[in-house]
């Protein structure tokens, strides 16, 4: 952790910023204001191709803080920019001034009794909003591709949309009420008559300006017609001036103007949406046409009453994914002009679904197709089809040259012009050197995306991009009357072209809107309204080479939702951004002082607080595991002494674990003698002397026991299983306050015995380890020696993989699956119980409410559903806390860096109902932290299964027959 006080960095700022900082410090704690080089760089990064580094980053937690900050910003004339999840693509969430980041809080919501409306604070993810509506069979209208990662504030501020919502169910069309904070800090609640009346009195001049613009548009039939026509297709270029045509009340106009305003008119503190039906029944078809014209003619025949989505993919799009695992073989044999439509229909029931699929076939009957239309409602087959579409963007990210950026441009055309426009777009791409760029999009909306990968470190490629954009913009606007931005927002990227698309009169009114709402031009200046015609070519983000593990990162931020340290220190995207900067500074030698500062601060903010769980890779479009890079950094930092120590521990593993067990037993004895309060005070005082002393908590385990077979398990001719008790469970037993005080291996042997398995233990068990503890710390040599030692032992006792291997710890099993001989059939507790034991035991469901925690490794092995099945066989009510992912305990980090565990599990206790008295998981160290922060005992799922299962009666009879001495 950096030891430099914030004042060191603050003193270097211009005086206006120093004064602004001092004002904010009266109501924002110092730990939520960042001014150092690392965090301003890291938090300043978003998913766009632009890089601006803020002077200050402030984490805001509620509306009052935003209101007071805006008041101070107005007083000191300081520009501010709002940031939600940072997934926007057009440069609307970057700044070189003050960045306000939503952090903590902002998660309140309410659903109407019938589910037809939902009120949401801006920090809620789009997918979370839909989860709140799931029980009503409804969802929010806007459906951007980033819905699992984007926050409601950004979705609304950008009027973001996706495959299904079109122009009828986007944020603009479904917003009903809003809480808005204006440039002077004033709050307006449009649902509250008193707030509306107060605003009418205090901001009469603003409302009068809105009314004047409304009246001017209404008096000009040509302008009104232009606005209506342009918003018949998707359009996020400029402001939502259709608000002046669609509404007459000035506050209703303001409410709709805020949609798509990108933080330039005010801050959306809460929004209420009208929800839409979420049909459960879906069917998909991938339809191939001989050329683009045929595909676009097919789109013209479809409508949203019949089809919910129709995704267009040109031949280069299909080619980009044809070699990926799971892709259909026939993709490789298609002609170069072939174009595909991926169509989805939805219905309330199977009958309605069948009607719609037949209707699609009828509508497209006369249009030439390469193959007959075949729909599937099977989940796995539909997922295979949609993986083609989802794989397009990652395919480009994976094959681009190191150092290049990724740009996803976003245009829309009137549907009747789509075919010609697409072909002309392709010819422009070829002419400007982007002939390998793919084209895909939401065909029902005439909305196309195309992906470029320029190297903006090369001046000639910047010039190439400039000339390309000039020609594309002219073509979209002048030839086809299209939208330069359909759903990604104007930002900096399209700000210089707003007047080109809208014309002088409409653009003049947009300027008036900006001046009315932001008279000092302090709200996100340079976005939407901008006097700099070259802003889209300035401050282009460098993507310097750093290391092959992370070089493919496109900085989209999709990784961040899974990161346990994201609210404590940094996220995977921020780690990669920082490492790229460090690599560039090392290479150029340009700023040694800055380099040293970044390197020093990164130790805590980047390396030490990385849990290396790898969940970031599961949502990364290009599958980057930032944890692997962290382990590489740890590996490179080790000297010979550290490596020698690791090798010594690996060679003497049995003795080391015996010592740890003894230490844990001593601590447990002291806990029993002193009691929890006194022990806790003593342990806290001891740790205050040095952070190197592990943190003791009341859930610290006692020493474990090595597994021993005390008698015959199973009977003659019974199936065999190899049981490998992990070293962590051999070392760590239950805690004093745990419900079941047996060592885990005893519970495992008990359920295997009930299921009539003959159990085999590996020889020399006490020295065996999967090596994960070494691997996570970057001791790769020691880790490799332990995994190979284990491999040899398991092959021997499983008869070279003939018998399944049961490991009682999920993270260890995950590593074993990655590293061991593929002949071995390896299972962790949940999967083995689900696949092997549930039909061999009788379960009695307990009248209890329990919680389960799906560990990172279980999530990566996609065992979440099996975990639920096992748990629901055991208890009446099962809780899976929605906002709890990786626990952040990360081996020993829960002891050494308890703040990481606390940050990761901040939402655990609030998610547990009062009648939930126990929790279950499948990793001993994770269970320690879960118990501490959930305030209930978490133990292995094995204990629960043992408690509520019995032998099947027929197996009892078999045992009696076997044990009887017949005469």
Protein language model annotation of sequence segments:
Residues 12, 24, 48-80, 98-144, ...:
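N-terminal glycine-rich flavin-associated loop
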Residues 271, 305-402, 437, 441-442, ...:
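Terminal amphipathic helices with adjacent charged low-complexity linkers/tails
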Residues 395, 496-545:
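Activity-critical C-terminal alpha-helical subdomain
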Residues 529, 566-602, 623-649, 936-945:
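Non-heme iron-sulfur electron-transfer modules
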Residues 518, 627-967:
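Iron-sulfur cluster-binding electron-transfer modules in prokaryotic oxidoreductases
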Residues 546-567, 600-624, 857, 884-885:
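Cysteine-centered iron-sulfur cluster-binding motifs in ferredoxin-type domains/subunits
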Residues 155-157, 164-171, 175-390, 423, ...:
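C-terminal substrate-binding/cap subdomain adjacent to the FAD-binding core in PCMH-type
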Residues 1-71, 75, 85-116, 145, ...:
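N-terminal flexible segment immediately upstream of the FAD-binding catalytic core
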């Amino acid at each position: 952790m950096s030891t430099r006080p914030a004042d060191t960095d603050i003193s270097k700022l211009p005086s206006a910023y120093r004064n602004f900082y001092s004002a904010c410090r009266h109501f924002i704690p110092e730990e939520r204001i960042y001014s150092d080089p690392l965090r301003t760089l890291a938090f300043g990064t978003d998913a766009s191709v632009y890089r601006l580094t803020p002077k200050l980053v402030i984490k805001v937690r509620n509306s009052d803080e935003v209101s007071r900050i805006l008041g101070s910003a107005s007083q000191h004339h300081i520009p501010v920019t709002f940031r939600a999840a940072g997934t926007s693509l057009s440069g609307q969430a970057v700044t070189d001034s003050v960045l306000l980041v939503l952090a903590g809080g902002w998660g309140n919501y309410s659903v109407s009794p019938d589910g037809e409306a939902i009120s949401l604070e801006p920090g809620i993810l789009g997918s979370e909003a839909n989860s709140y509506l799931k029980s009503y069979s409804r969802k929010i209208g806007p459906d951007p591709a980033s819905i699992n990662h984007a926050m409601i504030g950004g979705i609304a501020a950008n009027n973001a949309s996706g495959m299904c919502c079109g122009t009828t169910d986007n944020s603009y069309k479904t917003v009903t009420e809003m809480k808005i904070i204006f440039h002077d800090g004033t709050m307006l609640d449009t649902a509250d008559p008193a707030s509306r009346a107060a605003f009418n009195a205090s901001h009469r001049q603003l409302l009068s300006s809105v009314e004047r613009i409304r009246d001017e548009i209404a008096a000009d039939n040509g302008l009104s017609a232009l606005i209506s026509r342009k918003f018949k297709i998707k359009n996020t270029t400029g402001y939502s001036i259709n608000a002046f045509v669609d509404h007459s009340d000035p506050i209703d106009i303001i409410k709709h103007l805020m949609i798509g305003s990108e933080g330039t008119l005010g801050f959306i503190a809460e929004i209420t949406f009208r929800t839409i039906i979420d049909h459960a029944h879906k069917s998909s078809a991938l339809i191939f046409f001989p050329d683009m014209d045929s595909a676009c003619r097919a789109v013209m025949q479809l409508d949203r009453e019949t089809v919910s989505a129709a995704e267009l993919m040109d031949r280069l799009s299909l080619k980009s994914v044809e070699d990926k695992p799971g892709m259909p073989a026939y993709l490789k044999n298609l002609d170069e002009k072939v174009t595909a439509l991926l169509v989805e229909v939805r219905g309330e029931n199977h009958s309605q679904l069948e009607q719609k699929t037949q209707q699609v076939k009828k509508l497209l009957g006369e249009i030439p197709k390469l193959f007959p239309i075949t729909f599937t409602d099977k989940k796995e087959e539909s997922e295979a089809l949609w993986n083609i579409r989802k794989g397009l963007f990652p395919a480009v990210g994976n094959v681009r040259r190191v150092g290049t950026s990724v740009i996803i441009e976003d245009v829309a055309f009137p549907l009747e012009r789509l075919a010609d426009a697409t072909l002309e777009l392709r010819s422009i791409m070829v002419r400007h050197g982007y002939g390998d760029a793919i084209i895909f999009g939401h065909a029902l909306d005439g909305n196309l995306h195309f992906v470029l990968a320029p190297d903006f470190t090369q001046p000639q490629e910047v010039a190439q991009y400039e000339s390309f954009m000039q020609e594309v913009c002219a073509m979209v606007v002048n030839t086809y009357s299209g939208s330069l931005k359909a759903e990604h927002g104007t930002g900096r990227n399209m700000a210089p072209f707003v007047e080109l698309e809208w014309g002088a009169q409409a653009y003049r009114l947009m300027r008036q809107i900006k001046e009315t709402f932001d008279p000092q031009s302090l709200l996100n200046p340079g976005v939407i309204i901008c006097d700099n015609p070259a802003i889209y070519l300035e401050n282009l983000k460098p993507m310097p080479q750093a290391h092959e593990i992370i070089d493919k990162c496109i900085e989209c931020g999709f990784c961040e939702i899974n990161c346990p340290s994201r609210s404590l220190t940094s996220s995977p995207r921020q780690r990669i951004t920082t490492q790229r900067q460090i690599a560039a500074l090392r290479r150029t030698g340009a700023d040694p002082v800055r380099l040293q500062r970044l390197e020093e601060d990164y130790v805590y903010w980047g390396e030490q607080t990385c849990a290396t769980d790898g969940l970031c890779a599961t949502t990364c479009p290009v599958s980057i595991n930032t944890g692997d890079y962290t382990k590489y950094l740890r590996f490179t930092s080790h000297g010979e002494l550290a490596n020698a120590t690791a090798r010594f521990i690996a060679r003497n593993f049995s003795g080391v674990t015996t010592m740890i067990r003894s230490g844990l037993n001593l601590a447990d004895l002291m806990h029993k003698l002193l009691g929890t309060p006194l022990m806790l005070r003593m342990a806290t005082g001891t740790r205050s002397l040095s952070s190197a002393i592990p943190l003791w908590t009341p859930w610290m385990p006692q020493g474990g026991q090595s597994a021993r077979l005390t008698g015959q398990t199973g009977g003659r001719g019974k199936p065999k299983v190899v049981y490998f008790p992990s070293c962590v469970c051999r070392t760590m037993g239950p805690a004093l306050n745990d419900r079941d005080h047996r060592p885990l291996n005893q519970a495992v042997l008990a359920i295997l015995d009930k299921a009539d398995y003959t159990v085999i233990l590996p020889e020399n068990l006490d020295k065996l380890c999967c090596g994960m503890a070494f691997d996570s710390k970057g001791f790769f040599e020691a880790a490799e020696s332990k995994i190979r030692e284990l491999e040899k032992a398991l092959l021997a006792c499983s008869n070279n993989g003939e018998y399944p291997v049961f490991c009682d710890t999920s993270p260890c099993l995950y590593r074993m699956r990655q590293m061991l001989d593929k002949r071995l059939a390896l299972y962790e507790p949940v999967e083995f119980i689900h696949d092997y034991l549930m039909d061999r035991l009788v379960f009695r469901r307990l009248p209890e409410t329990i919680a389960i925690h799906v560990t990172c490794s279980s999530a990566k092995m996609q065992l979440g559903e099996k975990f639920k099945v096992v748990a629901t066989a055991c208890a009446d009510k099962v809780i899976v806390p929605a906002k709890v992912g990786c626990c952040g305990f990360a081996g020993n980090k829960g002891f050494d860096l308890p703040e990481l565990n606390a940050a990761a599990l901040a939402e655990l206790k609030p998610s547990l109902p009062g009648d939930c008295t126990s929790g279950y998981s499948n990793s001993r160290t994770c269970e320690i932290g879960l118990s501490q922060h959930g305030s209930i005992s978490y133990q292995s799922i094995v204990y629960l299964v043992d408690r509520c299962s019995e032998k099947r009666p027929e197996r009892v009879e078999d045992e009696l027959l076997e044990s009887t001495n017949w005469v």
